[in-house]
UniProtKB/Swiss-Prot annotation:
Family from the record: Belongs to the HisA/HisF family.
CDD domains xrefs: HisF
Organism placement in taxonomy: Bacteria, Pseudomonadati, Pseudomonadota, Gammaproteobacteria, Enterobacterales
Protein name as catalogued: Imidazole glycerol phosphate synthase subunit HisF
Subunit structure: Heterodimer of HisH and HisF.
PANTHER family: IMIDAZOLE GLYCEROL PHOSPHATE SYNTHASE HISHF, IMIDAZOLE GLYCEROL PHOSPHATE SYNTHASE SUBUNIT HISF/H IGP SYNTHASE SUBUNIT HISF/H
Reaction(s) this enzyme catalyzes, per UniProt: 5-[(5-phospho-1-deoxy-D-ribulos-1-ylimino)methylamino]-1-(5-phospho-beta-D-ribosyl)imidazole-4-carboxamide + L-glutamine = D-erythro-1-(imidazol-4-yl)glycerol 3-phosphate + 5-amino-1-(5-phospho-beta-D-ribosyl)imidazole-4-carboxamide + L-glutamate + H(+)
């Protein structure tokens, strides 16, 4: 059995790490490189960086900090933000990223997933899915351009349909960003995760809602996700990564303990 992964997420805007609640009202957390180094030293299995306004601004991720991150950490990291071409992806990978993630650009042009997978291999192509539960309809829908709340829009895709679509097109991993739970710290949406897990044959990463160590445990035990991503509990030092991994190991979760 592959070890489960603990993945801090760093949302980047204007060269700094920020964090919002339900993808809104972002506050500045700190500088990118020191935070990345801290998480690597605490025992994170990998890091994910989202340049959250790149797609809505019509630009690609600022590549200058990618090189600096690669110089100070020795764990894998994934970069996302406005990657629309093979050239964009190649440059980010050449600067030291291990994976690239696409989200809004893939919704605009789903063939991008296949072209990236064919060129670089499925192992380094991640698809991020920003999913919102509509209480009126009882359905989960995929949202686009979520880094800028003034430009966010609901797409035609229901979440499970898009999960199936991106796998067919070559996604090597899926990060499910559950917007209703984002930053609230009341736990992951286990109901949604279980549904997506049934439809997902590639590694699945849960994102949105972690507030306690037990929330991570629930995601691994009940939804059988491959990794759990979180931001605010790590940024605000509510949970220490090393202590979290020790707790999970004590509970019988297969996890890499430093």
């Amino acid at each position: 059995m592959l070890a489960k992964r603990i993945i801090p997420c760093l949302d980047v805007r204007d060269g700094q790490v920020v964090k919002g609640v339900q993808f809104r009202n972002h506050e500045i957390i700190g500088d990118i490189v020191p935070l990345a180094k801290r998480y690597a030293e605490e025992g994170a299995d990998e890091l994910v960086f989202y340049d959250i306004t790149a797609s809505s601004d019509g630009r690609v991720v600022d590549k200058s900090w990618v090189t600096r991150v690669a110089e100070v950490i020795d764990i894998p990291f994934c970069v996302a933000g406005g990657i629309k071409t093979l050239e964009d992806a190649a440059q980010i990978l050449s600067f030291g990223a291990d994976k690239i993630s696409v989200n809004s650009p893939a919704l605009a042009d789903p063939t991008l997933i296949t072209r990236l997978a064919d060129r670089f291999g499925v192992q380094c192509i991640v698809v991020g899915i920003d999913t919102w539960f509509d209480e009126e309809t009882g359905k989960y829908h995929v949202n686009q351009y979520t880094g800028d709340e003034s430009r966010t829009r609901v797409t035609q895709w229901e979440t499970l349909d898009w999960v199936r679509e991106v796998q067919q097109r070559g996604a090597g991993e899926i990060v499910l960003n559950m917007m209703n739970q984002d930053g609230v710290r009341n736990g992951y949406d286990l109901v949604q995760l279980k549904k997506v897990r049934e439809a997902c044959r590639v590694p699945l990463i849960a994102s949105g809602g972690a507030g306690t160590m037990e929330h991570f445990l629930d995601a691994f035990r009940e939804a059988n996700v491959d990794g759990a991503l979180a931001a605010s509990v790590f940024h605000k030092q509510i949970i220490n990564i090393g202590e979290l991994k020790a707790f999970l190991a004590q509970q019988g979760v297969e996890i890499r303990v430093c």
